[in-house]
Amino acid sequence: MLFMAGPAASWSLRPLGLHGVPQALCAVLLTVLVMKTLVLGDTKLEDLHPQSLPLNKYLNCYRCLLETEELGCLLGSDTCLTPLGSSCVTLHIKNSSGFNVMVSDCYSKEQMVHCSYTRASPVFGFWIFYQCCFLDFCNNPDNRKNSMH
């Protein structure tokens, strides 16, 4: 039997509406796959050093790789820059039992085809809903309810 000490000992997946270990593992796998795609997807060399870019030509977005409404950002809270004409995005990963996690990031013009789009995820029983917006920090938790519909 495995025992955990510290804060991890009191963590439980029950409040998130998960009803079994397989479902929890699928949810974690799906979240990791989405985060990998967002982080490593279409990274270009000039995107790696945004400090040297003129800010008036770029949209500032909120970035969080794992977030829940109840707990806020759990992994990777940051900002990102994307050229004007692109968008900020929040992906909602949901299932029918009420599980809902979010991933927020910048989207390039080429990725904007997914805006306001719902699709099935690679993990059975989950789906992904994309929401895009076009103002500075419109996808952060405080602005999301007003700027994303």
Curated annotation (Swiss-Prot):
According to the record, the signal peptide region is 1-41
List the Pfam families hit by this protein, alphabetically: UPAR_LY6
Keyword Repeat (UniProt): no
Secreted among the record's keywords? yes
Q: Which residues are glycosylated?
A: 95
Q: What is the annotated localization of this protein?
A: Secreted
In which domain of life is the source organism classified?
Eukaryota
The record's Gene Ontology cellular component field reads:
external side of plasma membrane; extracellular region; protein-containing complex
Q: Where is the UPAR/Ly6 domain?
A: 59-149
User: Per UniProt, which keywords does this protein have?
Assistant: Disulfide bond, Glycoprotein, Secreted, Signal
The protein's PTM annotation reads: N-glycosylated.
> What GO terms are given for molecular function?
identical protein binding
List the expressing tissues.
Detected in adult brain.
What does this chain do? Answer: May have a role in hematopoietic cell differentiation.
User: What name does this protein carry?
Assistant: Lymphocyte antigen 6 complex locus protein G5c
Originating organism: Mus musculus
Q: What is the lineage of its organism?
A: Eukaryota, Metazoa, Chordata, Craniata, Vertebrata
Gene that this sequence comes from: Ly6g5c
